[in-house]
Amino acid sequence: MQFTSLAKSLALGATLLAALAAPVAAQVKEHTFKVGIGLSDDHQQAQAVRHFAERLQAKSGGKMNAKLFASGALGNDVSMTSALRGGTLEMTIPDSSTLMSLIKPFGVLNLPLTFNNEAEADAVLDGPFGQKLLAMLPDKGLIGLGFWENGFRHVTNSRRAINTADDLAGLKLRVIQSPLFLDTFNALGTNATPMPFTELYTAMEQKAVDGQENPPATILASKFYEVQKHLVLSRHMYSAWVLLISKKTWDGLSADEKKIVQEAAREATVFERKTIRAFSETALGELKKAGMQITELPAAEQAKLRT
């Protein structure tokens, strides 16, 4: 009898804990958020979006979901961010530099050689400074749910090996559509050319540009090794993405629904950083196997990139 009573008590306790652990299902409505990204469906960013969708579904009893649209199907970073502000798209994950035209302090994150390693970046982005940046977004029609890692950026090109900072001079490099990127690379003597990411592969294939700059994971996933011979480990900038949701969408959610989205976003952020860092460790080896010639700038040469 005592055993039966104990079992019943434990079962009741478990039921109560389950009820307290998540919002009441009846208070959560059905929502499907379209998430547009410029990168390919097999990129680590896309994997993290799918993880976010899984966590949304699990936490909402299947009522909330996120649907991925990859490879620029819904536009580029600039146009998709604009769509969020207008309320015609629910979510996107642009490079932080995309937000500089709306909020200038976001440009600080893309200054050359700002961070020495990922731990420093995490401390800044997850700390008071990063949170202050996110707090500026609602006035622009956006809600920031966290910072995802793109990684340290490196230069590739089809013309020559880069062994010194001066070797960059004269190269026509595609850069992000941001005044900061344009000014930085023009100062280094390159012909900086702003261009949507979705147009980049074809532009390199047709020799419209000599090269570009991105982290190893993106270089590999986008198969840039097919049209680029040289990669220099320049580590000239650390690049972060911002997980965004439209404020119009956000304002239409209940308190319980917002909590679910925030919790799923936090878990997806941890997943994304872990996944892309693990992949980046192997990406350089894969790029070398694919035929890319990889050089590394000496510390003294890298310091010259701090323009």
Language-model segments: which ranges?
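Bacterial N-terminal signal peptides that target proteins for export
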Residues: M1-A14
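Sec/Tat signal peptide C-region and signal peptidase I cleavage site
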Residues: L20-A26
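N-terminal secretory/targeting leader peptides
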Residues: Q27-E120, P128-T307
